[in-house]
């Protein structure tokens, strides 16, 4: 019982919660920030709305990363009496924090780049390719967190 304390699953639940909460916060910020840029740009150039929706889609993908890890963690949560160790709880917490905080950072980056990018693309269409490349690098930050989280999750 010493290696399976009653508070072990608490850390696993916190890992699942932090995975979805922080990545959803990043996705929401990215969507809101780039969405305001799209709204401001579409007043003058409404034909560019569909082309400018890419940052919003990329921000939404960040939340999916957190959802995947949260579901994985929630699926392996169990009672301490069923061999859910404190080690598993800490691993799940680390995995959730890894994907959550990297998703938060990626969402912030996508939002800021997406806002400035769609406004700039409306005035100079050649900026579109550069905006997409920067958005890809911002999205990869969230993907790195997903990779680390899945790697940690498999260590149980």
Curated annotation (Swiss-Prot):
Entry membrane topology: Multi-pass membrane protein
The record places the site described as Essential for proton translocation at 139
What superkingdom heads the lineage? Eukaryota
Keyword ATP-binding: yes or no? no
Q: Which GO terms describe its molecular function?
A: proton-transporting ATPase activity, rotational mechanism
Q: Which UniProt keywords apply?
A: Hydrogen ion transport, Ion transport, Membrane, Transmembrane, Transmembrane helix, Transport
Record field: transmembrane: 8-30, 53-73, 93-114, 127-152
Gene Ontology, cellular component aspect: proton-transporting V-type ATPase, V0 domain
Similarity remark:
Belongs to the V-ATPase proteolipid subunit family.
Listed under subunit, the entry gives:
V-ATPase is a heteromultimeric enzyme made up of two complexes: the ATP-hydrolytic V1 complex and the proton translocation V0 complex. The V1 complex consists of three catalytic AB heterodimers that form a heterohexamer, three peripheral stalks each consisting of EG heterodimers, one central rotor including subunits D and F, and the regulatory subunits C and H. The proton translocation complex V0 consists of the proton transport subunit a, a ring of proteolipid subunits c9c'', rotary subunit d, subunits e and f, and the accessory subunits VhaAC45 and ATP6AP2.
Q: What does this protein do?
A: Proton-conducting pore forming subunit of the V0 complex of vacuolar(H+)-ATPase (V-ATPase), a multisubunit enzyme composed of a peripheral complex (V1) that hydrolyzes ATP and a membrane integral complex (V0) that translocates protons. V-ATPase is responsible for acidifying and maintaining the pH of intracellular compartments and in some cell types, is targeted to the plasma membrane, where it is responsible for acidifying the extracellular environment.
Protein name per UniProt: V-type proton ATPase 16 kDa proteolipid subunit c
Please name the gene that encodes this protein: VHA16
